[in-house]
Amino acid sequence: MIEVIYDKDKEKDKQESNEKNEHEVSVNLRLPKNIRQIGSPDGHKRIYMEDYVVTYLNYIARPGSTQARGAILLGESKKSDAGDVIFISGAVDAQNIEFDMDESEFTQEAWTTIYDQVKQFFPGLSVMGWFLSRMGFSTAINDKIEKMHVENFPGKDKVLFITDSLESEDAFYMYEHGQLVKQKGYYIYYEKNE
């Protein structure tokens, strides 16, 4: 037999704690205050992408570019009491990778070039996933895209951000339960210029 005990005082304390500050996820993690919500992000996994990165990725995926384009997303992942939080604060154009979905691959040479750029322009940031722009192909993924993700970006905290600039659609995917799962939304955050 399982006995469930309800402590009214603990529940009240927990509710007050949750109401204090929605931007304070845990003692060590403070979320950006100046944000824009896209979609309906899940409370257990949050993705925050810096506005600069969004602008850069939009430039890469600009309308008129008929070829698939890609970039490597950089940032950090944090664990908190409220769940996992991924911050994307940089991106490196993957010019040296041909994004033809039938032949795409991240070679050792491509990764060497990417890591050299990361070290030079974004020291301290980690690879958090990748960006793919496919004009006119929607934000749906196929087996080849999923295979590329699993082979090159293993782990639960790695993301795929895919756009279709023709339809002005975008979506984040994360690897969950053995497959890439489309996320319900994300946040764009704005840093103050110093």
Residue ranges and their predicted role:
Residues M1-G129, M135-E194:
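N-terminal beta-strand/alpha-helix entry module and adjacent surface
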